[in-house]
Amino acid sequence: MAEEQESALQLPPSTAPEAEVPTEVSPETATPEPPSSAAVSPGTEEPVGDTKKKIDILLKAVGDTPIMKTKKWAVERTRTIQGLFDFIKKFLKLVASEQLFIYVNQSFAPSPDQEVGTLYECFGSDGKLVLHYCKSQAWG
């Protein structure tokens, strides 16, 4: 059996506010920042850097929807479902008028503004989030 390839999903930046540009600070006005709590005491909480990592999503076709050759993708936690809609439509070369539905665990359609990271925390299993996509309404 061929091993599934994992690809990094390259989507355009989300509509979130732009990152602030660091400003230049002179040595006289610079004040040292206190160390973060994760750096001071190792606890059960994850460090802040771990929340920025990408998560794996598994995209499965339903019905007569074309199957993607690459099914497993690494996606930023802050990506929205709308970003996935746009990516899948572009990847499958669907016409803008064609509908696309995404379902979590074959049960419900998440809101377009829902972040993938939140869905992963609630419904992810085995280190990945399984999403089903189709061109016609299938569940719920």
Swiss-Prot record:
Its main location: cytoplasm. Residues 20-42 have a biased composition (Low complexity). InterPro entries: Atg12, Ubiquitin-like_domsf. Disulfide bonds: none annotated. The keyword Nucleotidyltransferase does not apply. There is a cross-link at residue 140 (Glycyl lysine isopeptide (Gly-Lys) (interchain with K-? in acceptor protein)). Acetylated by EP300. GO terms for biological process: autophagosome assembly; autophagosome maturation; autophagy of mitochondrion; glycophagy; innate immune response; piecemeal microautophagy of the nucleus. GO terms for molecular function: protein tag activity. One of its GO terms (cellular component) is autophagosome membrane. Keywords: Acetylation, Autophagy, Cytoplasm, Immunity, Innate immunity, Isopeptide bond, Membrane, Ubl conjugation pathway. Ubiquitin-like protein involved in autophagy vesicles formation. Conjugation with ATG5 through a ubiquitin-like conjugating system involving also ATG7 as an E1-like activating enzyme and ATG10 as an E2-like conjugating enzyme, is essential for its function. The ATG12-ATG5 conjugate acts as an E3-like enzyme which is required for lipidation of ATG8 family proteins and their association to the vesicle membranes. The ATG12-ATG5 conjugate also negatively regulates the innate antiviral immune response by blocking the type I IFN production pathway through direct association with RARRES3 and MAVS. Shares weak sequence similarity with ubiquitin family, but contains an 'ubiquitin superfold' and the C-terminal Gly is required for isopeptide linkage. Belongs to the ATG12 family. Forms a conjugate with ATG5. Part of the minor complex composed of 4 sets of ATG12-ATG5 and ATG16L1 (400 kDa); this complex interacts with ATG3 leading to disruption of ATG7 interaction and promotion of ATG8-like proteins lipidation. Forms an 800-kDa complex composed of ATG12-ATG5 and ATG16L2. Interacts with DHX58/RIG-1, IFIH1/MDA5 and MAVS/IPS-1 in monomeric form as well as in ATG12-ATG5 conjugate. The interaction with MAVS is further enhanced upon vesicular stomatitis virus (VSV) infection. This is Ubiquitin-like protein ATG12.
